[in-house]
Structures are given as C-alpha cells and as structure tokens.
Design a protein with these regions (language model features):
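Glycine-rich beta-alpha loop segments
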Residues: 1-79
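Short, solvent-exposed amphipathic alpha-helical segments in soluble enzyme
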Residues: 34-35, 65-66, 133-137, 164-167, ...
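Fold-independent oxyanion-binding glycine-rich loops
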Residues: 20-22, 51-52, 80-83, 100, ...
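SAM-dependent methyltransferases
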Residues: 1-20, 179, 184-215
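Short, charged/polar "capping" segments at the starts of alpha-helices
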Residues: 26, 86-88, 156-159
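Conserved phosphate- and dinucleotide-binding cores of soluble alpha/beta proteins
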Residues: 92-93, 100-182, 189
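Acidic/glycine-enriched connector segments
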Residues: 55-119
C-alpha cells in the first residue's frame, strides 16, 4: 500500500464505487465478475472506491490493481474502511485508506466521491448502501446523473417488487427508476460507466459533481 498520508484524492478524477458482500469467497462467480469489472475500470484509468475489506471488496481492489498495467496509469484504489469486530481484514492494493467508526460518516464519503455506483450481490450492509444512494438520488442530495448499476440476477426480484408495490401504489414515481440499471455481464456495465465518464470528461462548467454538491 502506498503512503496514505501523502496521497490525496484528486477532485478531477472520475470514480466508480463498488458495493458488495464481505462474505463472498474467491472462486465464486460473483467474485470473478467484480474482479473483472474492476480490472476494466482500471484499464480505462478510472479511480475505484470500495469498502476496503474482504470478499467482493477484495475482488474489486485486486482487479483494479491488475488493470493498472500501463506505465502512465494514474488511477487509484480508495478504501473506505469500517471498523468492525468481526471483519478486520483490509483489502490488498489500496492506494488510499480512510477508516471510519460510524457507517453514516462512511456512507457520506462514498456519496461525496462517487460518479457511478455499482452494487454487487450482498446482504444487509450492501442493501443499506443501495437504498442510501437511491434515496439521496431521489431527493437530489446527490447529482441526478449518477447511475446505479445492479450486478447479477439477485436484484431482479427487488426491482420487480419496487414496481409492483411502491410504484403501483404511487409511493414512488417512475422517474425514481430512471437511474437503475440491471446488468449480468461486464460489457453493459462498462457501457453505462463509459457514458457517464464521457459526460464527465466534457468538462462542462455546469456538470454536477457530488464532491461539490454533497456536504
């Protein structure tokens, strides 16, 4: 790991957050899925943000490290680590690590730094991260150009339920689903990420950046 005291988060870098389970093991399909996606993110010279822990967080940081083969690739892997008594292993290949005692503070940093949010399969913590992002997107506390990419078929039932229950009962609006994308492979995920990156790279002075908007 590089000296985290000397590294600073570059506000001009495009960053992709990946949320997912700490319980997923190497060799599982989802681990490889996240590893491959993170590698592509690095190859496209985008920063990665993860929880900096085991499981899919580890898959993300390892994949991102593997993708930085170009000499002038200046992308970074950022770990926002929550201190838990049962989850002490820190992910490898983090360039910058921030430690948190409270989930709320950690989530706020994720929101401030992320240009795209990718949600891999996970449990209560991952679902919290998904709905926290979704809620802030709905009320425009973060930029309304942030895509939420859901990886794998696990999320299909949840989105079906959101349509059949809250949407049908008019508890949410159709537009609340506009930024939700279900994908099962890396290419469509990267297509969405690259579209967002293209908008970011235009450098329009009016482009919404969470690092400026979310406090």
């Amino acid at each position: 790991m590089k000296n985290t005291k000397k590294l600073r988060i570059n506000k001009k870098h495009f960053r992709v957050a990946i949320f997912g389970s700490a319980r997923t093991k190497k060799g599982e399909k989802t681990y490889q899925f996240v590893h491959n996606l993170a590698k592509l993110i690095a190859e496209n010279e985008m920063d990665l943000i993860s929880g900096g822990g085991p499981g899919l967080m580890d898959a993300a940081s390892r994949g991102h490290h593997l993708g930085r083969t170009k000499k002038n690739n200046h992308s970074h892997s950022i770990g926002l680590v929550i201190k838990l008594p049962h989850e002490q292993t820190t992910g490898y290949h983090l360039d910058l690590q921030r430690d948190f005692a409270k989930f709320s503070n950690r989530l706020d940093d994720f929101m401030k730094l992320s240009n795209v949010v990718v949600v891999a399969p996970g449990g209560i913590g991952t679902i919290l991260e998904l709905f926290y992002t979704w809620q802030l997107l709905q009320v425009k506390h973060i930029c309304d150009n942030v895509p939420i990419i859901l990886l794998g078929p696990m999320w299909n039932g949840l989105i079906d339920w959101m349509k059949k229950q809250p949407l049908n009962k008019k508890l949410i609006s159709k537009t609340d689903l506009d930024n939700i994308f279900l994908v099962n492979t890396c290419p469509p995920a990267m297509k969405i990420i690259n579209i967002a990156k293209g908008e970011f790279d235009k450098g329009d002075k009016n482009i919404c950046l969470n690092i400026k908007k979310y406090h």
